[in-house]
């Protein structure tokens, strides 16, 4: 905290000492409105959304791929983390057992893993947020630190590495130009929920700075369900010259979360507030800490060339008390990216070329200790080791825009491997070894065709892959399985996007077909032990639809606030099946992948009024979900609604006050917000498949924003 305060004071003194020049004053006068005008600056036609994930800035409607964008306005609906925002993306199934137990699947990828998010890459700007084990966590990401999210559905990004499920890119929030701003917010809610946040930002012509702090705590609805998180975020952008700029991002979080774990069907029906008995006895918890930093430089070179480079550090440490053992783990990742790109225009043709490399290294130390009697007392060491992993991606991409047609071709070349050193010498098994995976070439080809005005068709072919983690490569005897192969998939997509009725309507329709081969299936060999095996293939097919509609309201001027009614609808229907899978002499071919509903739907209706009053109604539904490979048991489908009402007003044109109240799970639906697939069970102990979704609960929030517009 002392270091943070020192950084805050140094930057603050530097920024306050800088004065905008006359040229900047003129620009500011033309582009920056007063605080009252900013309240009304809502585009009453749907704005043209820009996509930058492919490193070729363009409009969403003309992008040749399945991409979804979550704006800052939508992120404001996520109180604790980005879970509720991501759940509105068609193709994503987001499950939240507790505030600290989150699982995301994208187009069915990773559905068979009982916990956590696998085979989907997450980036915070250019900083990788996934671990050496290939796992991504979402529960410690504060939506207030973000300006938008871009979701690439399917293995479509040769630039970020063609991950099997897709890529999620978080774009950090930054200070607004020529505005000094202080924000304070506080929320209180049911089940002991409490949140405080504060941020300071200052934007000047040559640099801008944003510093934010946040704290969240909750008693939880269930037993052994307390949660506490503190986090900070710093984002600074510096313009060194007309051609050279730099960006620094620094963020960290500290979480203390109890674990109630999943429950069986009888407990779910009769005593859903109870924790699993063994987790309650040991007072199970997880204590993850994380800090990450990244610095990037961008240089505009002669003849329309641009060079950029970035480096990152990502440090994490966690302690987890579980009924079967204690886990202590720490990881330190580092790496960087180098990228060159060039744009050339000739007549009606525009060519955009880029090439670069991503480097990722991580060292992980972990140990398992006995939990004596499952009562929470740490015992003797059972396992200890060190893992070093590397991933190198070389990529290139060429985009050609020829009148109404855009053709994009790209390729990613991946080299990956790891070394494991077994530091536990009390047994006869030595798990030490090196493993270098066969290099993988993942191409991408896409075509976008502007058939009429704002109507576009696109098609793409992509190859994706997923590298096995260390735990997946170890055999039941603890030896490295050198026969295991990376998963691979070819994905075929087609889609249609249109902006209609004077940009009041936006439609996004996508079809996809993906076949995953060398399918890595996690096989449970103990309550906490899974090993991987290549087990045939799976088939993933689906349709995804997004509709945005301004029902009432049009923009007449920047200074007027008008009545507006906006609808957002997202729907996905899919068929995910084992195509060829046999385990323990049982043939599961043709069965549905467990953990995935056939249909999901989310929608919202937003009302805005000239007097500052606004409301939002949200609805989310899910079809029933198969709970095991046999498809012999299903969880019930559900429909959950929420409603929010708020009022915005200003004092002295500089202070904006926003007060809201939200009712979550409006109808008090009893549903499973997360399921644990293939949960083990016996005749005396039924399988614990279910996490309970919270009953009806309330939050009240007060936001204060002070803005000083520089002249």
List where the protein language model places each region.
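N-terminal periplasmic accessory domains that precede
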Residues: 37, 48, 82-85, 103-105, ...
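Transmembrane beta-barrel wall of Gram-negative outer-membrane proteins
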Residues: 181, 188-217, 222-260, 285-301, ...
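Short acidic/polar hinge/loop motifs at secondary-structure boundaries
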Residues: 127-153
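Gram-negative outer-membrane beta-barrel transporters
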Residues: 401, 511-515, 533-625, 703
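C-terminal beta-signal and adjacent terminal beta-strands/loops
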Residues: 562-565, 624-626, 647-711
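Structural signature of Gram-negative outer-membrane beta-barrels, strongest in the C-terminal barrel
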Residues: 346-362, 385-515
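Face-selective signature of the C-terminal outer-membrane beta-barrel domain
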Residues: 239-253, 284-425, 508-511, 547-550, ...
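Membrane-embedded beta-barrel scaffold of Gram-negative outer-membrane proteins
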Residues: 306-312, 316-319, 450, 456-462, ...
């Amino acid at each position: 905290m002392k270091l943070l305060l020192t950084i805050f004071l140094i930057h603050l003194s530097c920024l306050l000492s800088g004065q905008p020049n006359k040229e900047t004053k003129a620009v500011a006068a033309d582009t920056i409105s007063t605080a009252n005008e900013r309240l009304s600056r809502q585009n009453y036609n749907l704005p043209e959304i820009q996509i930058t994930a492919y490193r070729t800035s363009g409009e969403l409607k003309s992008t040749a791929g399945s991409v979804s964008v979550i704006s800052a306005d939508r992120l404001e609906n996520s109180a604790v983390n980005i879970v509720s925002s991501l759940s509105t993306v068609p193709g994503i199934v987001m499950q939240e057992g507790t505030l600290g137990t989150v699982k995301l699947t994208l187009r069915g990828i990773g559905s068979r893993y009982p916990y956590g998010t696998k085979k989907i890459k997450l980036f915070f700007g250019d900083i990788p947020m996934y671990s050496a084990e290939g796992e991504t966590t979402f529960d410690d990401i504060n939506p207030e630190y973000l300006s938008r999210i871009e979701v690439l559905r399917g293995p479509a990004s040769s630039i970020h590495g063609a991950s099997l499920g897709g890529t999620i890119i978080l774009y950090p929030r930054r200070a607004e130009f020529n505005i000094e701003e202080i924000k304070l917010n506080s929320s209180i809610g049911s089940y002991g929920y409490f949140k405080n946040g504060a941020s300071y930002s200052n934007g000047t012509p040559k640099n801008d700075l944003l510093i934010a702090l946040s704290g969240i705590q909750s008693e939880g609805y269930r037993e052994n369900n307390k949660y506490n998180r503190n986090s900070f975020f710093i984002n600074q952008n510096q313009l060194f010259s007309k051609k050279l700029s730099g960006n620094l991002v620094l963020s960290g979080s500290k979480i203390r979360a109890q674990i109630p774990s999943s429950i069986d069907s009888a407990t779910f029906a009769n005593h859903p507030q109870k924790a699993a008995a063994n987790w309650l006895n040991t007072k199970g918890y997880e204590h993850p800490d994380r800090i990450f930093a990244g610095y990037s430089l961008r240089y505009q070179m002669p003849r329309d060339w641009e060079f950029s480079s970035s480096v990152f550090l990502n440090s994490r440490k966690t302690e987890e008390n579980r009924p079967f053992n204690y886990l202590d783990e720490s990881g330190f990742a580092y790496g960087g990216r180098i990228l060159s790109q060039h744009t050339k225009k000739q007549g009606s043709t525009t060519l955009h070329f880029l090439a670069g490399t991503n480097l990722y290294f991580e060292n992980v130390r972990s140990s398992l200790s006995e939990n004596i009697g499952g009562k929470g007392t740490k015992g003797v060491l059972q396992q200890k080791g060190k893992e070093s992993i590397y991933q190198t991606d070389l990529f290139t991409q060429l985009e050609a825009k020829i009148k109404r047609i855009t053709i994009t071709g790209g390729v990613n070349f991946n080299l990956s491997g790891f070394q494991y050193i077994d530091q536990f010498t009390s047994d006869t098994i030595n798990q030490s070894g090196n493993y270098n995976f066969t290099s993988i070439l993942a191409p991408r080809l896409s075509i976008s065709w502007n058939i009429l005005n704002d109507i576009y068709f696109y098609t793409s072919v992509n190859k994706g892959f997923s590298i096995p983690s260390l735990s997946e490569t170890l055999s039941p005897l603890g030896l490295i399985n050198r026969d295991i192969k990376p998963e691979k998939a070819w994905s075929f997509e087609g889609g249609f996007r249109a902006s209609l009725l004077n940009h009041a309507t936006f439609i996004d329709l996508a079809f996809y077909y993906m076949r995953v081969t060398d399918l890595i299936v996690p096989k449970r060999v103990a309550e906490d032990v899974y090993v991987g095996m290549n087990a045939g293939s799976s088939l993933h097919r689906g349709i995804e639809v997004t509709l945005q509609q301004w029902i009432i309201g049009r923009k007449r001027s920047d200074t007027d606030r008008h009545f507006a009614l906006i609808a957002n609808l997202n729907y996905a229907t899919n068929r995910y099946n084992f195509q060829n899978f046999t385990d323990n002499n049982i043939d599961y071919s043709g069965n549905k992948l467990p953990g995935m509903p056939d249909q999901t739907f989310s929608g919202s209706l937003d009302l805005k009024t000239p007097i500052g009053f606004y409301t939002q109604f949200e609805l989310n539904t899910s079809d029933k979900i198969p709970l095991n490979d046999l498809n012999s048991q299903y969880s019930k489908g559900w429909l959950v609604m929420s409603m929010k009402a708020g009022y915005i007003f200003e004092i002295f044109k500089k202070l904006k006050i926003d007060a809201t109240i939200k009712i979550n799970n409006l109808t008090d639906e009893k549903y499973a917000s997360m399921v644990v697939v293939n949960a083990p069970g016996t005749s005396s102990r039924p399988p614990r498949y279910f996490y309970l979704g919270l009953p009806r609960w309330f939050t009240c929030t007060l936001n204060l924003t002070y803005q000083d517009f520089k002249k």
